A protein has these predicted regions:
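Conserved beta-propeller blade repeats
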Residues: 1-3, 20-41, 63-85, 113-133, ...
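Beta-propeller blade-edge and WD-like acidic-aromatic loop motif
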Residues: 1-18, 34-66, 80-108, 131-132, ...
């Protein structure tokens, strides 16, 4: 679904983003410094986050711009870079905060960062001083089997299809 917002004074959620043609999910919102613009990932199919794109949207005007094809879970780094996940790696691209535009080529920064191919989530964060923390692991398919686990640890498979389950 599209993203929604609630005033700091409370009230009902209001639509913030609307799908462009072919989009079916907006996820991983992150405010840019100043709080007047928002980064997010827009996907065309929930099962293919490698085809997602990174988008920026002005909260004042609603104007949006596509920034990166094939990226998800965007964040702004204090170094002046837009950082995002792509295929189990983090990439960084120079970003002009005033013009809300990418100003250079993307470069890989960290390989082997855990990323869900099911929902596009990339497990990383920055501190206020720019330090990066992440979970190692690369792309994870999310395919799993449901089992009963006894108190002694033995597993009994359930008659359920193997697929990406969430909890």
């Amino acid at each position: 679904s599209g993203l929604e917002q609630v005033s700091d004074a409370g009230g009902s959620p209001q639509p913030l983003t609307r799908f462009d043609k072919g989009e079916n999910s907006h996820r991983w919102p992150a405010f840019l410094p100043g709080g007047k613009s928002l980064l997010f990932a827009a996907a065309f199919t929930a099962a293919n986050w490698s085809a997602a794109k990174v988008v920026v949207q002005s909260l004042d005007t609603g104007e949006r711009r596509d920034l990166v094809q094939g990226g998800t879970n965007p964040k702004y780094a204090s170094s002046g870079h837009l950082v995002y996940g792509q295929g189990g790696s983090l990439k960084a691209v120079p970003f002009d905060l005033r013009q809300l535009k990418v100003t250079g080529a993307a470069v890989p920064t960290v390989e082997g960062v855990r990323q869900s191919t099911f929902n596009g989530h990339v497990q990383y964060s920055f501190s206020n001083t720019g330090s990066l923390v992440y979970v190692a692991g690369g792309s994870q398919s999310g395919q799993g089997k449901l089992v009963w686990v006894s108190r002694n640890g033995s597993e009994q498979p359930l008659a359920a299809p193997e697929r990406a389950y969430e909890f």
